[in-house]
C-alpha cells in the first residue's frame, strides 16, 4: 500500500476505489450512488477535490441536480416499504457481514482517507476502527429494539409497546472523519429498519463511497442507502424534503444551527453535533510524563481537526511550570504528508482552513498572547504547496482573546493558567461549548469534584479524548449539540425509531349490554 501511495505524489491521479469517469479536464468525476448503482451526475457544476498535501486536483465532485437528489430519496422511500418489514435477524446478518468486509478493506479505506483528507495512515485506520465499533454495536439490534409489555393492565386487557423505524433518514457528514461519521449514522439507521440518504463532505467523499459499496456486498438491498453530493443546495434539499423524517449532522456551528432550525421547522427529528472548545485541566499531582504525552497527542493529532481534540490546556498551580517541557514535546512532532512513514501531523484539509488557522495565530500575537512554539511558517520539503501548519502553542491566553473564543480546528494548543481547581472549572463552565473535557490528576477527590461540577457532556479522568464506546452515547452538550437524542448507544436507537403502543382486549364472554359513554377507567 505504501508503494501505491508513493505513486500519488505529486499528481494523485489514480483513485481506483472511486466509481469514476473521465471529465473533459481529465480529472475523474465522483459518481452518485442511487438504488444500488453508481450514477454519473448530469450536472455542469463541480467542486474540485484536492490532495491536501499537494493541492493537486484528484477528482471533481458534482453538485447533484434536484432531480438526482429526488431520485435518491425516491429510491430510499421505495426500499423502505420492504426493508421496514425485514426481520431484525436479517438486518443483523447484514451488519455482521458489513463489519467483516470493513475489516477486510481497512487499509483500502485508510488509504482513501489519507489521500483525500490528509491524516496519517495510522490515524486513518483509527478513523475506520472507531466507526467499525458502531457497526459491531448495531449487530445487537434484535436486543436493542426490544419493546415493553404489561399483561392484564385491566381485566382481559394487555398493553405492549415496540419500536418502529421512522422511514427515510439523512446523514450530513463533515470532512474530518470521512469513515467514522458515516458509520455513526447509516448502520444504526439501517439496523433499526430505516433507509438513508448520505451527503458526505465534498472535500473527501471517497470513504463513504467505499462503505456503501460494502453495504451492498453485505446484502443490504438496493435503495436502502444512497449517496448524493453537493453543498448548500443539497443541505437545504435534505432539510426541506417532506419524505425525509430525520437528519443526523456533524460539523460546524453555522451549518449545524441552520440544519437544526430548518429541519425542525419542517417537522423533522434532528441531531446536530457542532463546534467545541475542549479543555484539559492539568493538576500538579498528575503523572507528568504521561500527562504531557497525552496532551501533546490529543492537541496535535489529526492536525487538530477533531471535534474532541484537546485544544485548550489549563495549567493549575505548580503545573504552570510544565510549559517548557510541553513545548519540547511538541517541537519533536514530525510534519509531513500523511502517507510518509513516521509522520505525526499531516496537512489541513484546505487552503481556506490553513488561512483561518494562520489568522487566529496572528490574532493571538496581536492580542498579547505568548507564542513559545510557532508553526506558521513551516515548509515541508517536497510538499511546498501543501496545507501544512506546524504544531503551535499559544500561552498566556485570556478568555477574551479571539484564539480562545473561536474554534481553531488546527494544530494549535491554547494554554491558560489557573490558581486552583475552582478557577479552572469556572473557565470551562464560562465557555459556551460542552463537547468534552479532561482532567489529569492522581487525586480521586479532585477528580470527583471536577466530574460533579463541570458542565460538559463528556469527561475524561486521565483520558485525554473521552469519546465513549458505542454501547454508550456520544453526549456532547450545551453549545456543542442541538437536539434531544445523541449519536449511537441507546440514544441512537431511540433517535432512529418511534414507539407504537397496542392495547388489546380479549374476552370469551362479552357482557356489555349497552355503550359505556364515560371515559374508560381501567381496573
UniProtKB/Swiss-Prot annotation:
Coiled coil location: none
Top EC category: oxidoreductase
Keyword Mitochondrion: yes
Pfam family, one: Aldedh
Active site (record annotation): 307
Catalytic activity: 2-methyl-3-oxopropanoate + NAD(+) + CoA + H2O = propanoyl-CoA + hydrogencarbonate + NADH + H(+); 3-oxopropanoate + NAD(+) + CoA + H2O = hydrogencarbonate + acetyl-CoA + NADH + H(+)
Alphabetized GO MF terms: malonate-semialdehyde dehydrogenase (acetylating) activity; methylmalonate-semialdehyde dehydrogenase (acylating, NAD) activity
A GO cellular-component term linked to this record: mitochondrion
Transit peptide: 1-22
Family according to the record: Belongs to the aldehyde dehydrogenase family.
NCBIfam families cross-referenced by the UniProt entry: MMSDH
Subunit structure as annotated in this protein's UniProt entry: Homodimer.
Name of the protein in its database record: Probable methylmalonate-semialdehyde/malonate-semialdehyde dehydrogenase [acylating], mitochondrial
Organism: Caenorhabditis elegans
Gene from which the chain derives: alh-8
Amino acid at each position: 500500500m505504501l508503494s501505491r501511495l508513493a505513486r500519488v505524489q505529486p499528481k494523485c491521479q489514480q483513485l481506483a476505489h472511486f466509481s469514476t469517469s473521465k471529465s473533459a479536464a481529465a480529472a475523474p468525476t465522483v459518481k452518485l450512488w442511487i438504488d444500488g448503482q453508481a450514477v454519473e451526475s448530469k450536472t455542469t457544476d463541480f467542486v474540485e477535490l484536492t490532495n491536501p498535501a499537494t493541492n493537486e486536483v484528484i477528482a471533481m465532485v458534482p453538485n447533484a441536480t434536484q432531480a438526482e437528489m429526488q431520485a435518491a430519496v425516491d429510491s430510499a422511500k421505495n426500499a423502505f416499504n420492504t426493508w421496514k418489514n425485514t426481520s431484525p435477524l436479517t438486518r443483523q446478518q447484514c451488519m455482521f457481514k458489513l463489519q467483516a468486509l470493513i475489516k477486510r478493506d481497512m487499509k483500502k479505506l485508510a488509504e482513501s482517507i489519507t489521500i483525500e483528507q490528509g491524516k496519517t495512515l495510522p490515524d486513518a485506520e483509527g478513523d475506520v476502527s472507531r466507526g467499525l465499533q458502531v457497526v459491531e454495536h448495531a449487530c445487537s439490534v434484535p436486543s436493542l429494539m426490544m419493546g415493553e409489555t404489561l399483561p392484564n393492565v385491566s381485566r382481559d386487557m394487555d398493553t405492549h409497546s415496540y419500536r418502529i423505524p421512522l422511514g427515510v433518514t439523512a446523514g450530513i457528514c463533515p470532512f474530518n472523519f470521512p469513515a467514522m461519521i458515516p458509520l455513526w449514522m447509516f448502520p444504526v439507521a439501517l439496523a433499526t429498519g430505516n433507509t438513508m440518504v448520505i451527503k458526505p463532505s465534498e472535500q473527501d467523499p471517497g470513504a463513504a463511497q467505499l462503505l456503501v459499496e460494502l453495504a451492498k456486498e453485505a446484502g443490504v438491498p438496493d435503495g436502502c442507502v444512497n449517496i448524493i453530493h453537493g453543498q448548500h443546495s443539497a443541505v437545504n434539499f435534505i432539510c426541506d424534503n417532506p419524505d425525509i423524517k430525520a437528519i443526523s449532522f456533524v460539523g460546524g456551528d453555522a451549518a449545524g444551527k441552520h440544519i437544526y432550525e430548518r429541519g425542525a421547522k419542517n417537522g423533522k427529528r434532528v441531531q446536530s453535533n457542532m463546534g467545541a472548545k475542549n479543555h484539559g485541566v492539568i493538576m500538579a499531582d498528575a503523572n507528568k510524563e504521561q500527562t504531557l504525552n497525552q496532551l501533546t497527542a490529543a492537541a496535535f493529532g489529526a492536525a487538530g481537526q477533531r471535534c474532541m481534540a484537546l485544544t485548550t490546556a489549563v495549567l493549575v498551580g505548580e503545573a504552570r511550570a510544565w510549559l517548557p517541557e510541553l513545548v519540547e514535546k511538541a517541537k519533536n512532532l514530525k510534519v509531513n504528508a500523511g502517507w510518509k512513514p513516521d509522520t505525526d501531523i499531516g496537512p489541513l484539509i484546505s487552503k481556506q482552513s490553513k488561512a483561518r488557522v494562520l489568522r487566529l495565530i496572528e490574532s493571538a500575537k496581536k492580542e498579547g498572547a505568548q507564542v513559545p512554539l510557532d508553526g506558521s511558517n513551516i515548509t515541508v520539503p517536497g510538499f511546498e504547496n501543501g496545507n501544512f501548519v506546524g504544531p503551535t502553542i499559544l500561552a498566556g491566553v485570556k478568555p477574551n482573546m479571539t484564539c480562545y473564543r473561536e474554534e481553531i480546528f488546527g494544530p494549535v494548543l491554547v494554554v491558560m493558567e489557573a490558581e486552583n481547581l475552582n478557577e479552572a472549572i469556572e473557565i470551562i463552565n464560562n465557555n459556551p461549548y460542552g463537547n468534552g473535557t479532561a482532567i489529569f490528576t492522581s487525586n480521586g477527590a479532585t477528580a470527583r469534584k471536577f466530574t460533579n461540577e463541570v458542565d460538559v457532556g463528556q469527561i475524561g479522568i486521565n483520558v485525554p479524548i473521552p469519546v465513549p464506546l458505542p454501547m454508550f452515547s456520544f453526549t456532547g452538550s450545551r453549545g456543542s449539540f442541538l437536539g434531544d437524542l445523541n449519536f449511537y448507544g441507546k440514544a441512537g436507537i431511540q433517535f432512529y425509531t418511534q414507539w407504537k403502543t397496542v392495547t388489546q382486549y380479549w374476552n370469551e364472554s362479552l357482557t356489555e349490554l349497552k355503550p359505556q359513554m364515560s371515559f374508560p377507567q381501567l381496573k
